[in-house]
Amino acid sequence: MKPIKTSWADEVEADYVDGLPPAKEYIEGEYKYVTEYKYNEDGKKIKVVRTFKIKKQVVSKAVAKRRNWVKFGESSSDKPGPNSQTTMAAEEIFMLFMGSKEFEQTNELQIDPGKNIAKCRICNGEHWSVNCPYKGTAMDSKTMMENKATAAAAAVGDPKSGKYVPPFLKEGGASGKPWARERDDSSAVRISNLSESMTEVDLEELVKKIGPHTKMYLAREKNTGLCKGFAYVHFKFRQDAAAAIEILNGHGYDHLILCVEWSKPQNQ
């Protein structure tokens, strides 16, 4: 006679008539498996199997001390860590640590009193200049050079003003557009495949040990402010840029593999 196959729910109910069986857990390699039993909205008994990856993390002494506090109430006999039966995890809050330069908004920002909103000095958009997606790009350089060219042109019109006149504006020099000259990107590298949580501080920590740099640009989404996944770093010396490509290309960072290459000219 063939044995009758029964479901796991019938077997559990036969062993634990008065209530739910206790939770079970076991560790296999770097994973921990937890099996729990509970009732769903329809009053049916269900089994929930959760898988956790064990990860060692260095924390401060205060955090380690809090984890050793004695639990109380319904969780008095629980093991270390939260219990889904008695603990509800709150919404995770992400903090963005900004450098001191990003707080210097006094000379960077313009406020429109009519609308009471921020006005970007780079693209004239309705956002702070420090959050402008065009910051550090050709548009940013063009805006600054236009202001300088306007002031210099006014000085040319008045030869008795005694103000300094740039060579490119003297005697009808060239086109009057200094930004039209080719920018030197020989020591610039492009870092791609960055995570959305990447910040300027993280980028600074990533490249500062390789060599001195003159400028960095981290591309961000216009609406969310999250990283677009790539950044540009202009090193002071070309050999440092070559070393950055050799060291960081294929390097694992924040669970992603970085791709580092020479920055291509804008006309390509």
Swiss-Prot record:
SUPFAM superfamilies: RNA-binding domain, RBD. GO terms for molecular function: RNA binding; translation initiation factor activity. Pfam families: eIF3g (PF12353), RRM_1 (PF00076). It is found in: Cytoplasm. Keywords: Cytoplasm, Initiation factor, Protein biosynthesis, RNA-binding. Residues 187-265 form the RRM domain. RNA-binding component of the eukaryotic translation initiation factor 3 (eIF-3) complex, which is involved in protein synthesis of a specialized repertoire of mRNAs and, together with other initiation factors, stimulates binding of mRNA and methionyl-tRNAi to the 40S ribosome. The eIF-3 complex specifically targets and initiates translation of a subset of mRNAs involved in cell proliferation. This subunit can bind 18S rRNA. This is Eukaryotic translation initiation factor 3 subunit G-2. It comes from Drosophila willistoni (Fruit fly). The gene is eIF3g2.
